[in-house]
Amino acid sequence: MHIVFSVDDLTESFWPVPAPAPSPGSSSTPSPTQNVADGMTRSQSEWAFHRLINELSGSDSSPTTNTIERSPPPVQSLSRLEETVDETEDVVEIQKPQNHRRLPVDDQGKNRNRAPSSDPVDSSAPVVVDPNQYHAILKSKLELACAAVARRVGTVKPEDSSASASNQKQAQGSIVAQTSPGASSVRFSPTTSTQKKPDVPARQTSISSRDDSDDDDLDGDADNGDPTDVKRARRMLSNRESARRSRRRKQEQMNEFDTQVGQLRAEHSTLINRLSDMNHKYDAAAVDNRILRADIETLRTKVKMAEETVKRVTGVNPLHWSRPNMGIPFSNTPSASSSIPPNSNHILKPANSSTNTSAGLAQNQRVETANFLPEQVNREGMQNPFAPDSNLYETLPHWNHKH
C-alpha cells in the first residue's frame, strides 16, 4: 500500500522555527556554531554569500527587509522521500528583473565563491534581494533534489540503472533558477531530458493489496509495447499466478490433513476405550477361571474321598460296578435262601422230573433274563449291604411253576 503526499505538505513540516533577521545597522555575520540548531553546516562560500545578503538587506529601507529568513533543513532519509515525491522531474525557473544580476544558485556551487566586490559592473549600484525570494530558491532546490533522489532510488529497475544515472546527470545540469523582486512563487516547467522512460511503472495511489498493485504495475508494463517488457511482465504474472495456486493447493492439503488428524484422533480415543473395556473383561475372565479351577480341584478331592470311603466300607472297588455282563452262577432250586457255592465251576442242572418241553422253555427264559440279573443284584446289594440274611438272588417266576 502506497500513499502519495504532495511536496508542499512534506517540506513545510520540515522547516525549523524561524529566527529573527539581524538588524540593518549590524554588519556582524553569524558564526557556524550559531546555526547548529538549524541543522545545516555551511561552507566558506555559503558564509560569504550570507554576508552579501546581510549587506544588501541592510541597505534596503523597504518593509521586505524585516521579513523572516529561513534556512533550509537537511535532506531527510531517502526512504521517506521515496514515498512522498512525485515521479516527474521539473526545472525551476524564477523571474528576475533585468537591472539585477543573477544569483549564483546553481547546484554545482561554482559562482558562490565569488565575492560581492569582484563584479565591476554591479559594484557601483546597490543590489536589493528579497529574503522571501532566497527562501523560494532554496525550497525549489530542495524539491528538485528530493525528486531526483526519489526517481533514482524508488522507481528505477535494476536493468535500467545506467540509463537512469545518465538521465539524472542531465537533469542536474539543466536546472536553471532565476529571481525577480515581484515574483516570489516557483514556476515549474517540464523538460524533454527529464521525461520518464516508458518501461518504469507508475506507483499506485489507491489502497489495495500488494498482489493487486503488482498486477496493475505489470499490466502497465505490458501496455507500453516493449516486447522484452511484455514477456517479462507475462512471466512475472504467470509466476505469481502459479504461486497463488500452489499456496491455495497447499492450504487445501493442510485443511484436509487437519480433518484426517481429527478423525484419527477420534478413532484413537474410541479404540483406547474399547481396549480398556476388553482389558477389564479379560481380568474378570481370568479371575473366574482361577475360581473354577479351584472348584474343580475341590470336587476332585471330594470324589476321591468318597471312593475311598465306599471301598473301605464295602470292600469292593467302585470302579468294578460299572463293568457290564458280570457272570453270576444261580441255582434252580426253589429255595430262596440258598447261598452261592464256593466252587465257581459248579454247574446247575435242571430237575429230572421236568419234561423235555418244559426244560427247553426254561433254558430260553434263563437266557432272556440273564442280562437283567446283575443290575438287580447290584441294586439290592447297594440298598442293603449290611443285611446278614439277605439273598442277592431272586428266583425266577417259572421256577415255582407246577407241573
From Swiss-Prot:
Q: Which Pfam families match?
A: bZIP_1, bZIP_C
Q: Does the keyword Transcription apply?
A: yes
Bias-annotated ranges (Low complexity): 24-33, 115-128, 161-174, 332-345
Could you name the domain of life of the organism this protein comes from? Eukaryota
Region of interest (Basic motif), ranges: 231-250
Report, as the record phrases it, the tissue specificity of this protein.
Answer: Expressed in roots, shoots, stems, leaves, stipulae, siliques, seeds, pollen, and flowers.
Q: Name one GO cellular component term.
A: nucleus
Record carries keyword Coiled coil = no
Which UniProt key words apply to this protein?
Answer: DNA-binding, Nucleus, Phosphoprotein, Seed storage protein, Storage protein, Transcription, Transcription regulation
Residue ranges of every copy of the bZIP domain listed in the record: 229-292
The sequence motif named Nuclear localization signal is recorded at 233-240
Q: How does it assemble?
A: Homodimer. Forms a heterodimer with BZIP1, BZIP1, BZIP2, BZIP9, BZIP11, BZIP44, BZIP53 and BZIP63. Interacts with ABI3 and forms a complex made of ABI3, BZIP53 and BZIP25.
Outline what the protein does: Transcription factor that binds to the 5'-ACGT-3' box, especially present in G-box-like motif (5'-CCACGTGGCC-3'), ABRE elements, of seed storage protein (SSP) encoding gene promoters (e.g. At2S and CRU3) and promotes their expression in seeds when in complex with ABI3 and BZIP53.
Family to which the UniProt record says this protein belongs = Belongs to the bZIP family.
- Its protein name is Basic leucine zipper 25
Origin species: Arabidopsis thaliana (Mouse-ear cress)
Q: What is the lineage of its organism?
A: Eukaryota, Viridiplantae, Streptophyta, Embryophyta, Tracheophyta
* Gene giving rise to this polypeptide: BZIP25
